[in-house]
């Protein structure tokens, strides 16, 4: 893998971590809708980093999800439950960002934040493993 792609993947992992850090601050200091947004985007940046290891990218969220499922979930490299959680967080983010009168429960968002961190940890480990194997 070219160094520029390694650098980009690592940058996106860092962006995922920073966005996750924002979500942890938001849970107590912002709306729950904003927290859901940050959880999803942290996961999105991590998945984008992973896709780079396969030379893949998409300008659309649906394309990122499709590549992620096709190349990693369906091939058994990422657990199916993580693929489902990523899709669920996309739907929740859409709902929170674009629908009126949405109300998330703090207990649910707190659980999603925990699962989001576990998701990012898993995707980061896999991304770095693939990078190391391709050196």
Question: Could you tell me what each predicted segment is?
Answer:
Residues 1-135:
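Terminal alpha-helical segments
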